Amino acid sequence: MRADLSQATFIIPIRIESPDRLRNVITTTAFLLENFDTNIIIQEVDKQSVFEKEALPILEDIVEVDIWKNFNFIHKKSDEPLFHRQRVLNEMIMECETDIVVNYDCDVILPKESYTLAYKGIMDNIYDVVYPYGQGMFQKQVAATDITVSKFLETGDYEFLNAVSKDHTSDFGWAQFFKTSVYKEGGMENENFKAYAPEAVSYTHLRAHETGND
């Protein structure tokens, strides 16, 4: 049974530059669709849509729910060499109609309870912003293969990922749950950061503290 995250929208900006990134995009999207009743917006910015050609057919084959029920895919054609992640995020934030928006990285999978606890904390008005991991703790870097992620998706057993992972620092983490109104009122993402970089995540965390939204 899927957990109810119906008042959350996961916004996932992507540019698929490698087979590893393609695998990660498929894995994280399938994981969210299979485990949560939620909303997803994926926006790909590139010359051509790798997601539409390579990922969508696989997702339609392996995911056992109607993937189009609460899923929106957008491709914006662009020849820009830099992936302007913050601008893409802001465009997707403005599309959100749910109480919670999740700035979500396509390379991240969290323990299932991390999603539900973050969601509940915001819906219960305990928090405005939740970082499910990070803050000086650690993350697991997974050396995934197609076989590994297939077994994980089929069984939901995190041990398949743990077996091929190592501990690594996580800083502020690449996934944040926001109360949507707070995210918008706070100015959303700083588009002066024009590429994919950890400074942008650190800035978001610092701004949340300075405005009292933590």
Features from the language model and the residues they span:
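N-proximal low-complexity "stem/linker" segments adjacent to membrane-targeting elements
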Residues: 1-31
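Short acidic, S/G/P-rich loop/turn micro-motifs used as interaction or catalytic elements
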Residues: 15-20, 47-49, 107-110, 136-137
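Acidic donor-binding segment of Leloir-type glycosyltransferases
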Residues: 31-77
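Glycine-rich, basic loop-to-helix element that forms the pyrophosphate-binding segment
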Residues: 79-95
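Short beta-strand-to-loop acidic/aromatic patch adjacent to the donor-nucleotide binding site
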Residues: 99-109
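Conserved catalytic core of nucleotide-sugar-dependent glycosyltransferases
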Residues: 111-191
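Acidic donor-binding loop at a coil-to-helix junction in glycosyltransferase catalytic cores
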Residues: 195-202
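Single conserved hydrophobic/aromatic residue that forms the stacking wall/gate
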Residues: 205-214
